[in-house]
Amino acid sequence: MSFARIFRTSALMGGAQVVVLAAAFIRAKVIALTLGAAGVGLIGFFNAFSGNISSFAGWGLGTSGVRVIAGAAEADRHAKIAAVRRLGWRLSALGLAAGLLLFWPVTWATFSSSLYATEMGIAALAVPCVIASSAWSAILQASGKISSLAKVQIFGALTGLLVGLPAIYIWGTIGIALSIFFAAVVPAFVLWRAARAACPSVCGVQVEQADIRYLVQLGGALMVVGWLGQLSSLLVRGAIVTQEGLAGAGYYQAAYAISGSLPGFVFAAMGADFFPRVAAAKDEADARGITETQIQAGLLLGAPLVMALLALGKLSLHLLYDSSFDAALPLLNWMAWGVFIRLMTWPLGFWLLARGATGTVILLESIGALIGAMLPIFLISHFGLISAAIAFTISSAVYGVAVAVVFRVRSAGWFGRELHVSAFALAGILAAGQWWAAGQLNEYAGCVPVALVAVACTWAYRLQVRQAASRCTDL
């Protein structure tokens, strides 16, 4: 997998991700200005609730569907797509039932009253839409329709924003829940239309029950993985609400959203193009080479953005939320380092999902989710809100070490020395840039290290492309 292809995919998915994230931050900005940090905390909790149910009822279809379709022979691909569609409808119905059954007890368990029960019920209606979207996205992704997927994401984000903003302004907290529903239902409908247009010939294909059973078996493991992650997020937010209040949850949500947003297009590109490619790799050596190239490209793409998080964090909080969100800055700084670690570990995580044994996937993800939930819950009661961000970085590092060990054993090889040197050098540069920016009085001074890192990464990318072209010429 060439650097050029990775960067083209990143440009497509990155452009879409920028629009999606801009829409999300505009919505968060409106909530912060109208309802304050408590409103931001509420939208974070509502999203965690609907995401937790979606992860459980979705049964890992968004990932298992890609793996099954991408790895199938061309003659069998239509049958696999038909199976993903059929299972997607069934799981969407299951998700709707689960959301409607659970929103009331979860409301009481969290808020000790039914004050936000209506809002939670509306947020539950987003669950089947999210599950359906995962099925249609899997079809487009595995079929290589990256540009179609990007266009759909842009249209869905803009439409959901235009419909959701008036609801927030008019109905307050109920409008927040409605905006979550609109942000889910619009993309689901558009993705459904795009999937039908991209693969019209599967409409009359008979669904094989063996394919359904395999998707259920594989998806069961992936569901456990996704659900553990969502449950971990929900438990952490619940602990923050209990011990630090809704305002504390709002600061955590602001830092979490910003830290995951700027490098988000790198992760989106990994899921859109890298995952189906590593799933279809002919052997472990080929998969290892694809993974190493992805990590190198991810570091070059993501390093300037992590530098922006570290050097321009305060400015980001003021622009995207409000000047009253300065309490989120220490959390953002810690989370930025967790994101840097994930630039290297996420490709390994995708490799594990694509090629790892089911039991290994469940074991490693369970360990990661357990640490990600228990560590912040324990630390918050002793060291306050910032410990939740510290725990985020620690859990990212622990998970990375664990999956790296599995990768080394299963692939019977390791990455080249160049990758290790590049990673440590980038970490040192980022730390120096953060230290320099912290000593400046002007909020915009952080643009200097960001620009320098961006220039260095651009030069490194051009060097990698020239070296790849030279190797091809020699062959």
Give names to the regions the model predicted.
Residues 1-24, 78-82, 115-117, 206-225, ...:
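N-terminal membrane topogenesis motif
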Residues 22, 121, 368, 417-470, ...:
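Transmembrane alpha-helical segments of multi-pass transport proteins
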Residues 58-74, 142, 255, 259-299, ...:
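Helix-loop junctions and terminal segments of transmembrane helices
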Residues 117-124, 150-199, 256, 366-374, ...:
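Hydrophobic alpha-helical transmembrane segments
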Residues 106-123, 292, 309-343, 347, ...:
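Interfacial segments at transmembrane-helix termini and the short loops linking adjacent helices
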Residues 1-6, 180, 191-233, 273-289, ...:
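Interhelical loop/hinge segments that connect adjacent transmembrane helices in multipass membrane
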Residues 29-30, 41-58, 221, 236-239, ...:
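Alpha-helical transmembrane segments of polytopic membrane transporters and translocases
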Residues 8-20, 24, 46, 55-107, ...:
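Membrane-water interface segments that mark the loop-to-transmembrane alpha-helix transition
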